[in-house]
Amino acid sequence: MTTILKHLPVGQRIGIAFSGGLDTSAALLWMRQKGAVPYAYTANLGQPDEEDYDAIPRRAMEYGAENARLIDCRKQLVAEGIAAIQCGAFHNTTGGLTYFNTTPLGRAVTGTMLVAAMKEDGVNIWGDGSTYKGNDIERFYRYGLLTNAELQIYKPWLDTDFIDELGGRHEMSEFMIACGFDYKMSVEKAYSTDSNMLGATHEAKDLEYLNSSVKIVNPIMGVKFWDESVKIPAEEVTVRFEQGHPVALNGKTFSDDVEMMLEANRIGGRHGLGMSDQIENRIIEAKSRGIYEAPGMALLHIAYERLLTGIHNEDTIEQYHAHGRQLGRLLYQGRWFDSQALMLRDSLQRWVASQITGEVTLELRRGNDYSILNTVSENLTYKPERLTMEKGDSVFSPDDRIGQLTMRNLDITDTREKLFGYAKTGLLSSSATSGLPQVENMENKGQ
């Protein structure tokens, strides 16, 4: 059976991931007019820029949907976001600022939950608005087929008939008006935005040019912290974790994790915390640029890693970072539920996150400027008395350290012999100043 359909399957049910925007509205209406039977599915991901979710299915019915459903994905989205924090599943960083993979997390939830809803309705053909140059076309493809092995894919933006008729926003707007719908295009921004309650992505258009900075972006989850006219008073916040799970903010517990994440977003957003500018590698290996917001994820991540460094030993922390980066890349590629990802998640949640219990108090200022004020945990292996410089009882003596250093003579001798061995083969050059062979100065190589 052909998985990807290049032309509209007339007379068949097609599920469309319906956002209510111009693109999916025009696509739904066009498919109905051309003889398909469209079903609309809208994911409630807690998008901060969406004002009325209930109105979206109503609009879909007006445009010709056979049926329209609103699927609440918020609980599952937050669960996956917390799992990503527990695992450090983030691989894109620039200058210490992290992209929290909020769009890939949203796609993992949307791609599985919407297709599951379609399957309940006997809909086995799926369409969405992803383009052939982006990451989402592959993410949705993978998650869709994982959820329904019989699924076929129809994307209007891969159909030449659709593109020839409605290939641009102007054409789509004119089409809607001609069909009796007073659909006015929204004010054209200098970039596009995609969001869920974990974070927002701003990209494309003017942001494709690296001389366009964060200053052209209007944040939807925070404040313009770079604008000195914006007053941002410092604020203290305490985050509590129990066995790797965030349970309280400023001493307040929450009835569910969705409410907790909303409050974390409000706190971090007041300061512009978690906003970053990243150049990344798409799945197809081409580089793209995005400006990201994730105030709540950033707040929880900072507190989690503070506890992590005080509780676990160096080798465990090293494995957390290495496996987290690997897992983050799998998540980015749409492989969050693949076996290799599940293996990494289980290991990190079982052996790392389970011990993360305690409280971290932060002072948030502007943007990503913050200080850690206090760290408290019953599981801390940080013991000041072990390394105190003050006179008093010690867990080890000067003689103990002399013995430990003496044992280092073995590998120091081995290393010295290797350095001179490298010099004999020409890999290192002799140095009159240091007494040891050195890597040749690259500046002198051509002289």
Curated annotation (Swiss-Prot):
Gene3D superfamilies to which the protein is assigned, alphabetical: 1.10.287.400, Argininosuccinate synthetase, chain A, domain 2, HUPs
CDD domains (UniProt xref): ASS
Subunit relationships: Homotetramer.
InterPro entries in the cross-refs: Arg_succ_synth_type2_subfam (IPR023437), Arginosuc_syn_C (IPR048268), Arginosuc_syn_N (IPR048267), Arginosuc_synth (IPR001518), Arginosuc_synth_CS (IPR018223), Arginosuc_synth_type_1_subfam (IPR023434), AS_cat/multimer_dom_body (IPR024074), AS_multimer_C_tail (IPR024073)
Subcellular location: Cytoplasm
Main location: cytoplasm
Taxonomic lineage of the native organism: Bacteria, Pseudomonadati, Pseudomonadota, Gammaproteobacteria, Enterobacterales
UniProt name for this protein: Argininosuccinate synthase
Family: Belongs to the argininosuccinate synthase family. Type 2 subfamily.
Entry GO terms, CC: cytoplasm
EC class: ligase
